Regions:
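N-terminal active-site beta-alpha-beta segment that forms phosphate/nucleotide-binding
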Residues: 50-162
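Positively charged, low-complexity intrinsically disordered leader regions
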Residues: 1-47
Length: 162
């Protein structure tokens, strides 16, 4: 599944079983994107400030758990849940003060535990996690658009915004 954006640019997107992410360390001088394929790469990106801002960190962490699910080699649901829990703990260590990080990780944890406890198959759990990560990102984008719509009236037309 590819998560499409209508914008010409993006800060993060899911494409071909990987997370593509703008490297914020180089902004505004240049746009550089990373392609992350493992939950460890996601954790390192959060730690190295590739991604900044609590909501964005939460979104990225959610996709990190999707990568953990897709990369797990576990053959049964209990081992699969343990793999996801290990990834969740690793991601939680990346930014201990980022509230959205823990909120997103908890939200994803509820998804996999609910599905696994109902003995649903792994493929369905993976798809459910991906859908939840996409929903977390969509909610954040909607919130940002609303902030912009409400804030535009506060900026005089003659102002220059950096």
């Amino acid at each position: 599944m590819e998560h499409a954006h209508t914008d010409q640019w993006f800060t993060l997107r899911w494409r071909d079983d990987a997370l593509e992410l703008i490297d914020q360390r180089f902004l505004p001088r240049r746009e550089e994107y990373l392609r992350l394929k493992t939950p460890e790469a996601v954790a390192e990106a959060i730690e190295k400030l590739v991604v900044r801002g609590a909501p964005a960190i939460g979104c990225v962490a959610a996709f990190g758990l999707v990568l953990a699910a897709k990369r797990s080699k576990s053959l049964n649901l209990e081992s699969f849940k343990k793999d996801l829990e290990l990834a969740r703990k690793r991601l939680a260590q990346t930014r201990p003060t980022a509230v959205n990080l823990f909120w997103a990780l908890e939200r994803m944890s509820l998804i996999w535990n609910d599905k696994a406890n109902r003995n649903l198959d792994r493929e369905f759990i993976e798809e459910s996690l991906l859908n939840e990560a996409i929903e977390i990102q969509r909610e954040d984008l909607d919130s940002c658009r609303k902030i912009g719509m409400h804030g535009v009236d506060l900026i005089p037309s003659s102002a220059r915004v950096l």
